A protein has these predicted regions:
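C-terminal hydrophobic helical "lid"/dimerization subdomain
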Residues: 1-3, 239, 267-271, 313-364
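Glycine-rich beta-strand-centered segment in the early N-terminal region that forms part
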Residues: 21-37, 50-101, 106, 144-146
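Short Gly/Pro-enriched turn/cap motifs at secondary-structure boundaries
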Residues: 21-22, 54-60, 120-125, 131-132, ...
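NAD(P)H dinucleotide-binding glycine-rich loop of Rossmann-like/cofactor-binding domains
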Residues: 94-185
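Mid-domain Rossmann-like dinucleotide-binding core that forms the NAD(H)/NADP(H) cofactor-binding site
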Residues: 145-235, 242
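Glycine-rich phosphate-binding loop and adjacent beta-alpha segment
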Residues: 203, 222, 227, 263-326, ...
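Short amphipathic alpha-helix with an adjacent loop that forms part of the alpha/beta core around
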Residues: 237-249
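Short SAM/SAH-binding signature in class I
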Residues: 251-257
Length: 364
């Protein structure tokens, strides 16, 4: 049996579609056939050269598949069996560092990953851009039977990313249900999920700030819960800043969630927050350059700035729980993924970069 995979050849280079032997499942691993695998913004950063990963390799960390091979006795320890639909989580924290012991394993200082292994050593296919994937059983999260696996795949990384950032806010004493006004900067996959999540966590008013000409994203944000979408290109930064500073009787907004990845967004975020406002920043993930900020504003406004990177398996579980508790979202989410075969990888990456797709998925 053979399986195709899209091999990452390096920044700015075309992916190569290659065939690999489907080998026996190693001990401790699950063997999955592809249902859907997302192209993440992180993968785009790899291809653009703003984040570095070795090549050649099979990248991709948003793999959702159906288990076709495992050691059944060993799998019982994880509540898994053949035929289960699962999300493959790539993070392997050490469990021993101070962060892991404090429950912050998403930021383990010795973090390893399950994907990106050698394509020259069996079983070859550890990454998500493949028709078959091998992931340790300990890193597989079962998708409940009442959740469409393609729906689960659509926000398999953006969802846990958002939830983890919000959990850090909650850990710092922020009660989302008591937030009056929140602003989401950026309407990519993370920002889009953040809109629906914040609204359903009880935030009274959720605004989004975006740029460019993409009415589809703006309409979707409103459908998912945004009370209003501001567009920097049409309305101008200064006008939007003034409008948001007027919230809460002229105090500004309570919470800002940065998901644009644009460094200049941080300046506006600090400007629109009220005194003691909370700024969640999971979006600044690539080396996009520096900007000038006014540190005095952090002090005088007593801003609470919380960076967030990565997520843990418990955030993936919380994501699936969120989908299960909000089934009305599924009919909307299932329409958001633009689907491509693995053989169409270069077209898929180009379309993902264009911004025209809400979410780009590889399917079998």
């Amino acid at each position: 049996m053979k399986a195709k995979a899209a091999v990452f050849m390096g920044a700015h280079k075309d992916f190569e579609v290659r065939e690999f032997d489907v080998t026996e499942c190693p001990a401790g691993y699950g063997q999955m056939e592809l249902i859907a695998s997302g192209i993440c913004g992180t993968d785009i950063h790899f291809h653009n050269g703003t984040l570095v990963v070795g090549a050649p390799t099979v990248i991709g960390h948003e793999f959702v598949g159906r288990i076709i091979g495992l050691d059944e006795k060993e799998a019982e320890k994880y509540g898994l069996k053949k035929g289960d639909n699962v999300i493959a989580d790539i993070a392997v924290p050490c469990g021993e560092c101070i962060l892991c012991k404090n429950g912050d394993d998403a930021n383990c200082v010795n973090m390893q990953v399950t994907n990106g292994g050698s394509i020259d050593v069996a079983p070859y296919l550890y990454g998500g851009y493949a028709q078959v994937n091998y992931t340790p059983l300990s890193n597989l999260i079962k998708i409940p039977e009442d959740i469409d696996p393609v729906v689960a795949a659509t926000f398999a990384c953006p969802g846990p990313t958002t939830i983890h950032a919000c959990s850090l806010a909650e850990k710092a004493g922020v009660n989302l249900s008591e937030i009056n006004v929140a602003v989401v900067q950026g309407l990519g996959p993370v920002g889009t999920f953040a809109v629906m999540y914040l609204k359903r966590m009880g935030v009274k008013k959720v605004y989004a700030v975006t740029a460019g000409d993409n009415a589809k994203r703006e309409e979707l944000a409103v459908t998912l819960g945004a009370d209003k979408v501001f567009n920097l290109t049409r309305e101008g930064k200064d006008n939007i800043t003034r409008a948001l500073q007027a919230e809460n009787g002229g105090l500004g907004v309570d919470l800002c969630f940065e998901a644009s990845g644009a460094p200049q967004a941080v300046v506006q975020g600090m400007d629109i927050l009220r005194n003691r406002g909370v700024y969640l920043i999971p979006g600044q993930y690539s080396a996009s350059g520096g900007i000038e900020i006014q540190p005095q504003m952090i002090t005088f406004k007593a801003l609470h700035i919380i960076g967030s990177s990565q997520y843990s398996m418990k955030d993936v579980e919380a994501y699936l729980d969120f989908l299960g508790k909000n089934p009305e979202l599924s009919p909307v989410i299932e329409k958001l993924g633009s689907k491509y075969k693995v053989e169409q990888i270069n077209e898929a990456v180009a379309d993902a970069k264009s911004g025209n797709n809400i979410k780009t998925l590889l399917v079998r």
